């Protein structure tokens, strides 16, 4: 059998909890919050790329 390491002891609880469902909503609101923050971040990047948001010290030159 394999050798036990500190890393395997640290990761074992994550593996033993795999497949178990937390009652109720669990961490769904937290996931929704992070998805919303990611959406806002990507939206800001897109607006900078399309020059919808004009930043004085920042310019985007694509192509020639």
UniProtKB/Swiss-Prot annotation:
Transmembrane spans: 29-49
Gene Ontology MF annotations: phosphate ion binding
ATP-binding among keywords: no
Localization in the cell: Cellular thylakoid membrane
Any one annotated GO CC term: photosystem II
Entry keyword set: Membrane, Photosynthesis, Photosystem II, Thylakoid, Transmembrane, Transmembrane helix
Pfam families: PsbH (PF00737)
InterPro entries xref list: PSII_PsbH, PSII_PsbH_sf
Membrane topology annotation: Single-pass membrane protein
GO biological processes: photosynthesis; protein stabilization
Quaternary data: PSII is composed of 1 copy each of membrane proteins PsbA, PsbB, PsbC, PsbD, PsbE, PsbF, PsbH, PsbI, PsbJ, PsbK, PsbL, PsbM, PsbT, PsbX, PsbY, PsbZ, Psb30/Ycf12, peripheral proteins PsbO, CyanoQ (PsbQ), PsbU, PsbV and a large number of cofactors. It forms dimeric complexes.
PANTHER family per the UniProt record, alphabetical: PHOTOSYSTEM II REACTION CENTER PROTEIN H
Listed name of the protein: Photosystem II reaction center protein H
Source organism of this protein record: Prochlorothrix hollandica
